[in-house]
């Protein structure tokens, strides 16, 4: 139990006992009652700080518990997301909130099927210090805010029930293909929800024409990739986008593939 709650409960019980003793005339004067009440408050505060020194809270353990809870809750979400509805927020437990529907590719995996990008979702949100958010996850009991500052990657974990503001510096981001290392913060998938159009931008320049889909992109999983059978594969270019339409992340279903033009 929280030490502060114990201290408050102790004072309330002590004060209640003093009131009972006064009503039973064991404490005759109000002056004596006032002095004893003040003494009880002082002793309670002293005991509270003594307890903090004698039994310090294990913040590392609490931090680990939060991380474990978050990792467990995120196992089933992979790169699943829902776009934010502007009439009301639509945020599934552990899912990613994308402000203005802008996401960022930050990690490249080289597979037998070509380059597959695990999307690290990005919003346009800037905090008071001007750092740019990379990932924001909002769950029932905790929030994760991953962001970049001066080339280093950090994340803050906030929990409603435990620690608020655990601030952790991550190891530097490693790219699987160094050819893409200069594109950090510069590759964006742009999505116009009103028209269900999606396109790719690098360094703010639109490098592909709009791609029209015959279904709503909500509840979709998006991959960027390249074809290992084409020359562009060796040069590390993205040449296609894959959209998995499924409401359940455990079953991605059949991908819809569109090439960049």
Swiss-Prot record:
It is a multi-pass membrane protein. Keywords: Cell membrane, Membrane, Transmembrane, Transmembrane helix. The keyword Transcription does not apply. The keyword Transmembrane applies. It comes from the Archaea. InterPro entries: ConA-like_dom_sf (IPR013320). GO terms for cellular component: plasma membrane. The chain crosses the membrane at residues 4-21, 33-55. This is Uncharacterized protein AF_2291. The lineage of its organism: Archaea, Methanobacteriati, Methanobacteriota, Archaeoglobi, Archaeoglobales.
